[in-house]
Amino acid sequence: MQGPPRSLRAGLSLDDFIPGHLQSHIGSSSRGTRVPVIRNGGSNTLNFQFHDPAPRTVCNGGYTPRRDASQHPDPAWYQTWPGPGSKPSASTKIPASQHTQNWSATWTKDSKRRDKRWVKYEGIGPVDESGMPIAPRSSVDRPRDWYRRMFQQIHRKMPDLQLDWTFEEPPRDPRHLGAQQRPAHRPGPATSSSGRSWDHSEELPRSTFNYRPGAFSTVLQPSNQVLRRREKVDNVWTEESWNQFLQELETGQRPKKPLVDDPGEKPSQPIEVLLERELAELSAELDKDLRAIETRLPSPKSSPAPRRAPEQRPPAGPASAWSSSYPHAPYLGSARSLSPHKMADGGSPFLGRRDFVYPSSTRDPSASNGGGSPARREEKKRKAARLKFDFQAQSPKELTLQKGDIVYIHKEVDKNWLEGEHHGRLGIFPANYVEVLPADEIPKPIKPPTYQVLEYGEAVAQYTFKGDLEVELSFRKGEHICLIRKVNENWYEGRITGTGRQGIFPASYVQVSREPRLRLCDDGPQLPTSPRLTAAARSARHPSSPSALRSPADPIDLGGQTSPRRTGFSFPTQEPRPQTQNLGTPGPALSHSRGPSHPLDLGTSSPNTSQIHWTPYRAMYQYRPQNEDELELREGDRVDVMQQCDDGWFVGVSRRTQKFGTFPGNYVAPV
């Protein structure tokens, strides 16, 4: 009798020698609970082997072994494709006895067994060429190891490369060389699978968990420091850290403490400080290079700077403070809120700062050393200018200057601002506040004239006067007033007898019994003035003193009558002619008809001379007065300005209405 085939002998197991009545219940349970398990890594094809997941039972004192899948024929299993080393079968459905471990199988939908079970992988399941798991986490037996392998592969270090050739680096500028010089030959201490390696001074990728803001690249670090850092990074992930990390992934809760302590040293200073320090170093190096270039170039010959003509500059629109109150006035500035003295008129002495950007110390190399090379600095110091108006600094970069001061120009910041020096102080100031002196003129400051009171006057108040400004003197009817000086035909300066109150007041409110006598003390040359008009002497005091007084109207020759209301001011004529002043007797009710005027700080006004400057202006926009002491302006009106206050308001006379008053300075432009 011919023996069984060799294939059948190879398929026999211990179950074939157990009686059937002892293994019938085991076979039925194994057929219902078999779970396919993927072995051999699961790459390319899926090779199934079935086993019973339940523990084996003991029969007759021995363990009952599992049955192999080849011993249980099942019509629901079909051949899909042959595994390596096997031959495909010609028939579609084959007996179960012919299944081997190298055959792959699929589960058919028409089968009666439709139990849904997860396919379990042994260990971490199949992996790709790099060792990263490709199976889902829920289908593996050891999810913690799967997590560990996945994390290690994501954050693994790139294999070291080894270069078998040598090369020479081109010579570099010593300023741009790093702290670690690169050798010409790169020996590779560690060889990877590709046979290449790099020097430790090269940049090595590290874990993203160890990233510290502000840390520099490892290219600029010594090799021993890089090696120490690599050792720290490799040793930080302990078993406790892994367990905490995996628990966080499974539960979805945040860790109570950091998983890994930062092995690197913490920066002693914030990143902002480090960046500012680097920027300052780069700026200093750039300034040094530019200064070196300037020393090599020949300095141009100095030429006298032309005189500025502020009258030729086009005026700008009114400030935002008035544009918000009067919709009819055009708004040409920015949306930033500004005080009235910050005007955008390039020709007005009260230059606006809305479009000015203060120059940075790194923009121009000459700003750091005060004017570049010594030759160029001497040339710029020869450009002297005299202040035409008082200028009060609004920021630390600006210079506070008085009228008549001499300032030495260092450079021109832009068309509206200059940088110069005054008594050792360096700062910026408006260009149209100064008058550049010719090169042949000796720069000499002009001191304002001083006055000496020879005899005080006396007056008695006929009406009660309440001053609207700080410089005005309020008094009641019947009080005796000591007259200090006569400001003009309409105003006096005096103080209440027996008190310390002092100020200016209208001449029509008092009965003068004796006029004051003054003497002008000139210690220097007079400021250039217009020859058209003559004016009486007036004193000038600092605005911070208690006697800081400024007149809303400087002395001029008047024609016609005047009243306590400061709107009946006559227009100044071209030639002065003496007129007798005919003062009317105002009623007491006139003292209550004065409305609240706009608060003007006349104590900081610029005219500090015995002669007045009449500057013609033309109204560019319409302005409606809000108080009785303000002028009404219409577009095209001619106005003679005699005083320009630091708050942006002008004091002058309208040729159209023949009235005297105040008005915003950026509504007019010089003619």
Curated annotation (Swiss-Prot):
InterPro entries tied to this protein: Endophilin_SH3RF, SH3-like_dom_sf, SH3_domain, SoHo_dom, Vinexin_SH3_1, Vinexin_SH3_2, Vinexin_SH3_3
PTM annotation (Phosphoserine): residues: 348, 395, 530, 544-545, 547, 551, 563
Keyword Cell membrane: no
One Gene Ontology MF term: vinculin binding
Annotated SH3 domain residues: 380-439, 454-515, 612-671
SoHo domain sequence ranges: 115-187
Chain segments carrying region Disordered: 46-111, 166-215, 249-268, 295-324, 337-383, 519-611
Any one GO cellular component localisation term in the record: cytoskeleton
Extent of Polar residues compositional bias: 88-108, 359-368, 560-584
UniProt keyword list: Acetylation, Cell adhesion, Cell junction, Cytoplasm, Cytoskeleton, Nucleus, Phosphoprotein, Repeat, SH3 domain
Gene Ontology biological-process entries: cell adhesion; cell-substrate adhesion; MAPK cascade; negative regulation of transcription by RNA polymerase II; positive regulation of cytoskeleton organization; positive regulation of MAPK cascade; positive regulation of stress fiber assembly
Subunit structure: Interacts with DLG5 through its third SH3 domain. Interacts with vinculin by the first two SH3 domains and the proline rich region of vinculin. Binds to SOS (guanine nucleotide exchange factor of RAS and RAC), through its third SH3 domain. The formation of this complex is down-regulated by phosphorylation of SOS. Interacts with INPPL1/SHIP2, SAFB2, SOCS7 and SRCIN1. Interacts with FASLG. Interacts with MAPK1/ERK2.
Stated name of the protein: Vinexin
Organism for this UniProt entry: Homo sapiens (Human)
Gene behind this protein: SORBS3
